[in-house]
């Protein structure tokens, strides 16, 4: 480890211990060395004993920076895994991170706009940030060209070196996981960290986020379910992004939503529909849908519409991934656990020699209790834990390409639980998935595939006669080459047979001559002639092999 990495590791350990987070270490035999190690660091006491555990955890993650804040944001939606006092504190990480100096943000904006003062492009620039997040912060202004209200997002200064240092440490920890845990290799921790690194680094490029927001806005342009604010690409760069300012109710503010007369049941169902539409229709989904990035429009509360911001992290799935996921979901919904087991084997998620009958029974045991119950009565955290234990028995591997999807699904579940506890996630999603699968097979799918390929074949049609002629000529040449190779192989086979024959004769003659020379010296020159003949036969056999 470099000196910088050692200092960062020391800072992380000191931060956790100074906030008394060793309290989270379970009191088990396997953790005894870790707890003894903590006692040895007696000069790092808990300096915040007056604060509750939830607040201490939030402050520690906030102090450690964006990599840890993002982790806390994900955990904030898992209210079935944490008591309310911890989940409520983690939720504050979403939009209450300490801001950096607004004057420094103004300097960054001016540098991004070619050195001109902010007043040359914007009116009413607010030096005090509207919001501050782990990666960037937002200031309000008006476009000088048309007077529209906008928000200006700027990246935190000097954030990249800190992120890279933390990621290097996480990589080191990931490489130790297979050595420390019996099933650590199956978790593929290094690949998971690599995927996380990619998404985190991508989030630092606001040009990428601008493109993502434009794409999502296009996908839901006429949708009653989701609105994405307009981006002004002429003002965007890697370190700055300008987009329409929106007004809405934070999706986590249930009291305000109810006061506004929002149809909570429809809102919760639309959250599920938006997720599955992004994944299966568009193959392009917002992968950072924690409550701090989702609002609800004040208008038409009886027909509520989501507003999505912060599109820095998005995910996409190929056709194979989508089809596999959809068939798996439908099999779950239909309680066809045999199909689920077979799909896992066919996809390679579990080894091909897996006992399908045993796997089916294990899945049935874990999944059957979750059906026919409202969402509020189901502990999906415990279901995931049971599935993990089942996977361990059958050597199921974590699929890094689906980590973002899994995280987003957790966000959707958490938001759904807060908005409408009676929401049946499975019942809401099942019709959508059945319709999507039906659309992928049959005559309509064939017609659609033909339409997609038609321009290619129209372009290639004039070249078809020449392509056919070239194929026939190459086929004839290939056949000639095959015949030539076959003749050479046959010739080599004959030569090798002859070679083995002469080598065998030579060995026999040499051995015979040697035997006679030792046991029958009275035979005179005969042993010498036999040995000479053997050497000649050996030479002929050797020549045959060349």
Swiss-Prot record:
The active site is at 288 (proton acceptor). One of its GO terms (molecular function) is protein kinase activity. ATP binds at residues 130-138, 153. GO terms for biological process: regulation of ubiquinone biosynthetic process; ubiquinone biosynthetic process. Its EC number is 2.7.-.-. It comes from the Bacteria. InterPro entries: ABC1_dom, Kinase-like_dom_sf, UbiB, UbiB_bact, UbiB_kinase. The keyword Transmembrane helix applies. The keyword tRNA-binding does not apply. Pathway: Cofactor biosynthesis; ubiquinone biosynthesis [regulation]. It is a multi-pass membrane protein. The chain crosses the membrane at residues 501-521, 522-542. Pfam families: ABC1 (PF03109). SUPFAM superfamilies: Protein kinase-like (PK-like) (SSF56112). Is probably a protein kinase regulator of UbiI activity which is involved in aerobic coenzyme Q (ubiquinone) biosynthesis. This is Probable protein kinase UbiB.
